């Protein structure tokens, strides 16, 4: 700090700083310690110098003794210089302490400054008609003197302490004591790795035992009086937490380390060390558990029919379509009857038909190699109708409906063959039909319903939809779709007057006319 800064502050500030400080005691103690260190360095240097002077007269002689003396001479010189530096540091500490003592003695005291303020207050209060003008002026001049004196004292103290700090010597690091020929000799012999490893393990073991010995000593001291020590720790943390943490931090660390390691460390290391023995047991248990797991097989996927039934493309004038239907359980078979019709021109060939699937479970479509195709017919109820498979538009529509229905059901299509046939209840043991018993309505359902509060009329009506077969051993158990009433029992049936015969149906269940 410069002189104008010291001058800017009142003398009370400087006097309070010097009076309330730690005093010169710490500087004097530091000077004493440096003096003792200087004496120790000097004693060590003198002892080592005497030892080096006696080396040539001992058992060592020749170059080895000379190398030994030459290796220690720099260290002896450093000890001598360190002793001088320590003595200089002690002298500078003493100079700083003397400067502080001088500044404190020359600084106006707080009592003098307080007395000056009290006298000034009294003189101003009793200054009637200016009778205290001269005493007030003298008092203010005395205060100005103390102001200037305090600033000057602080300036001198700053200069003296700064000079002592700047002139204090700096001790350099000690030189390494090494034999000049030792480096070459060390390269001759090879280093034994086992000795180096043993030395490293010994150092690690010493560090480990020292660390545990230190912790156990702290814990043992705490266990001598656990209640009293706990109370002391709590009081220390409540009064001064920082100092308590510095004082009792090592003890708390030792306790926490032991608690954590005993609860977590030992089980963890036990599992790690025993893992090679537990691995085969765990592997065996895992394989045994796998043996009891259920095996889920993937469902078999039935490939869809790659080649659907194709309708035969023939000329309409050369081949006449016919319908053949076999009704199982009734013992009748339908025969195809040709019918006259207008033939289209022979020059035009029909377009190829799209793939189509069978429309009924009891009717199997056939290819063109087996003659007229089987399946539902297209047209009205009367006359000879062409099968749907022989008409391109109808075949395409039937194929589209079949594909849509297959996609909705999400089922795999099954391959059908033209030479296969299906018998329904072929082993039921039905005898020859004795007569037309008629069809009666099924007893399932709510029956015929009318208006509320009215009774139904009992009259015979022809059943439509699902019916039950009469006169068999199953009663109304098995069901089958209705077929046209024109399909009578027996193999021979006269042709209808209009020439329609038995082939005039469209293949769909409906009532007979």
Curated annotation (Swiss-Prot):
It comes from the Bacteria. It is a multi-pass membrane protein. Signal peptide: none annotated. Residues 395-446, 469-513 are annotated as: Disordered. GO terms for cellular component: plasma membrane. Disruption phenotype: PE5-PPE4 double mutant exhibits a severe iron phenotype but secretes EsxG and EsxH normally. Mildly attenuated in vivo. GO terms for biological process: response to host immune response. The chain crosses the membrane at residues 233-253, 277-297, 309-329. It is found in: Cell membrane. Was identified as a high-confidence drug target. This is PPE family protein PPE4. The gene is PPE4.
